[in-house]
Amino acid sequence: MRQFAVTICLALLVACAEKPTVADTLPAPIVQPSLPVPMAPAPSSVDTPVLPTQTFAEWQQGFRQQALRSGVDAQLFDRAFEGVTPDMSVIKADRSQPEFSRPVWEYLDGAISPTRVRRGQAMLEQYADVLSSIEQRYGVERQVLVAVWGMESSFGQIQGDKSVIRSLATLAYEGRRPEFAQSQLLAALQILQNGDIQPERMLGSWAGAMGQTQFIPTTYNSHAVDFDGDGRRDIWNSAADALASTAHYLQSSGWQSGQTWGMEVRLPDGFDYALADGSSRKPVSEWQRLGVAALPGSAVPAGSENASAALLLPAGYRGPAFLVFDNFRAILKYNNSSSYALGVSLLAQRLQGSGYIQGAWPKDDTPLTRTERIELQSLLSARNYDAGAPDGIIGANTRKAIRSAQQSMGWPADGYPTHKLLEALRTQQ
């Protein structure tokens, strides 16, 4: 899990030997710039890199003193850092700003691919007893746990092969967020000191996410559990530990046992799309009063009639609409991306034979490139719609500015960045 994310909010003996397809192995993004603003705050992905003013050896010596003051054993520190040098591939990944992003419908195609669904159903059967025990203890449904497992590491097969110590040391030395990386590095050393894993086996992603459900070190220290009773919280090699740790985290994030994540809905003609920001919450009864209705043949889930929900439009007013409840928010705390939370939610349903979206995606409306998003932000601000810094990230300020511009043009104010809006702003120059 990542909370970097985040979590961001993770080697397993996988019984299913089927080789994953390309769609099945695509990593879930932390932030999908073309999606609504997540409900929980996420670290900026465009923080300015901190250029080192000292050598790596000098930085390491200073950090060693800090670690020892925090209770890390000197011999353990020296063993963990033996031969460690900066990993330039980590720096490259940290500073990468992709020009192109996938639209949400393509992301979801990978998240709930037939291969992933089949393998998830096989995992549900293989780990049925373990999952029953986890459900009983933490109250998180097994399909959700298996969905997270599949999204994060393809059921333990793709956990990352980088040294967590080296990656985090590199990021602490010259990454965009050195203080965050340093806190994670200190937490990683504490994991080693607790004896849960050896330094050479502590592998993960370039960002330091670890194990079968991709915990960052601080999240591991607060939520990882030894569910199989072997004395170690082994989220790398024990499916039971990884799944139970995920359940523990979701439980702590407000998971409501027996409740749904959300539901697809239809909106009335003339609906005020400014209400659909993915975070403003109203009782379901209030949404119904505004004309938001269940799809034909469906109904508000039992027990959710008086629940508080937000309205989510992942692809703007032309795409499907969803009311999302507390459990969706809990998934966002695991990984602060609306696309990720929607992927987990739909995959969990698909494992039970449901989770099919009825609304059509606006596939003729491809996402803006990073260069185009920066131009859009600059044009908005030039017209007194404060979009914030032109960084290519469509955050809260930019969406608010987009809504204001859309309202002034008499368009549906869904806050969704489109080529049509960009062209309209260009012609106003």
Go through the PLM ranges and name each one.
Residues A74-N306, G319-F322, F328-G343, L347-A348, ...:
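Catalytic glycan-binding domains that act on GlcNAc-containing polysaccharides
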Residues T48-G83:
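Mature N-terminal segment immediately following signal peptide/propeptide cleavage
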Residues L12-A15:
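C-terminal motif of bacterial Sec signal peptides marking the signal peptidase cleavage site
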Residues V22-Q54:
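Post-signal peptide N-terminal segment of mature Sec-exported envelope proteins
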Residues A17-K19:
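Bacterial signal peptide processing site
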Residues R2-C9:
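Sec-dependent signal peptide recognition
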Residues L368-R373, S381-L425:
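Short acidic, glycine/serine/threonine-rich helix-capping segments at coil-helix boundaries
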Residues P41-P49, Q61-F63, E106-V117:
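Acidic/histidine-rich, surface-exposed loop or edge segments in extracytoplasmic proteins
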